[in-house]
A protein has these predicted regions:
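Accessory beta->alpha helical hairpin/"wing" motif in late/C-terminal subdomains of nucleic-acid enzymes
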Residues: 298-301
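Short, solvent-exposed loop/turn and secondary-structure capping segments
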Residues: 48, 76-80, 121-123, 163-167, ...
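Alpha-helical cap/lid subdomain in secreted, periplasmic
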Residues: 132-293, 311, 315
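Secretory targeting and sorting signals
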Residues: 1-47
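Serine-esterase "nucleophile elbow" of acetyl-processing enzymes
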Residues: 48-115
Length: 317
């Protein structure tokens, strides 16, 4: 293989390498100009008085919506296997979704406990909380964020007389409910006193009364209709007592009992089902077929009704 000959580069005459003083001055000036131009491109933008007047964007301060209560405060619904589970579709989530667009810094804190009673909310024993109970955790949160809480909602008391539903007759049912109701009302008074003291003035607290799952008994013939009618009278009395406690503490009431038309046994034209029973079946899982039903928790549409009732009562909608 023949070697490749690399041509020799031409040699510039020595005279061409020399520069005059004037030439060097011009070259130096050009280099300085180039450096200055590069510095101008990579350096800070020139001052603009109009832009200087625009303040930096402010991050909105965090405010809070505190949701307290039982399983409804956690959006509990039955899953496909019929197991009651917490969901992100409860009334608290829907209230938060309605409030947040106009309040970018708003945060939702849910402390509700499925199965909670007024007594366990005070003393603990069902769900685990720092401080031992839901009420202690709520008080600690309100004290730590005083002046930054927009809204507190509460649903509690439905589970207190719930065990009375297992009584063998109407007489026993009524006696059981009458026995349990005064204690629940007293406990609610304690809860509200402590919440109001921790929250301070100006915080909106809205308590909820309840719809009545026992209305579903109406569908089981005459005996069931008597149970539904009797249960509605007891529920109306109980909800009125809860309402008086809320009003005495300065809280507002979300009238879910009324929103579900619980007291209305009239039958709309062309139907054989009372309006209150139809609403219960429409907005809860109580009338659903197994495995999801019967389940007393609200469905998504029912939680939407409850959320709307809370918003109207709060005055924030």
């Amino acid at each position: 293989m023949r070697p490749v000959r690399i041509p020799r580069l031409p040699r510039f005459p020595r005279a061409a390498a020399r520069t005059t003083t004037a030439a060097r001055t011009v070259t130096a000036a050009a280099v300085v100009a180039v450096i200055a131009a590069l510095t101008a491109c990579s350096g800070p933008a020139p001052s603009n008085p109009a832009l200087a007047k625009i303040p930096p964007a402010k991050v909105p301060p965090a405010t809070y919506y505190l949701a307290l209560g039982d399983s409804l405060a956690q959006g509990v619904q039955p899953n496909a296997a019929g197991v009651s589970v917490m969901t992100p579709d409860g009334y608290a989530d829907q209230v938060y979704a309605a409030l947040r667009p106009s309040r970018p810094g708003l945060k939702l804190v849910k402390l509700g406990c499925p199965g909670e009673t007024t007594a366990s909310m005070i003393n603990g024993g069902i769900c685990r909380y720092q401080g031992g109970s839901q009420l202690a955790a709520a008080v600690a949160f309100l004290q730590a964020h005083r002046g930054r809480v927009l809204l507190v909602t509460l649903d509690i008391g439905a589970n207190d007389p719930e065990h009375c539903g297992g009584q063998p007759g109407l007489g026993q049912l009524a006696k059981c409910a009458v026995k349990d109701i005064p204690g629940a009302v007293d406990h609610l008074g304690t809860i509200m006193t402590r919440l109001k003291a921790a929250a301070g003035p100006g915080v909106r607290i809205v308590g909820m009364n309840y719809y009545l799952p026992a209305l579903a008994e109406w569908r089981s013939g005459l005996p069931g209709r008597v149970v539904a009618w009797t249960a509605e009278k007891l529920a109306a009395t109980y909800n009125a007592m809860l309402g008086r406690v809320y009003a005495k503490s300065g809280a507002r009431v979300a009238n879910v009992f009324g929103a579900f038309e619980t007291a209305d046994f009239t039958k709309p034209a062309g139907t054989n089902v009372p309006r209150n029973v139809a609403r219960l079946c429409q907005w809860t899982w109580e009338c659903a077929a197994p495995p999801r039903g019967p389940n007393q928790h609200a469905n998504q549409a029912g939680y939407q009704v409850i959320a709307r009732t809370f918003l109207q009562a709060s005055g924030l909608s």
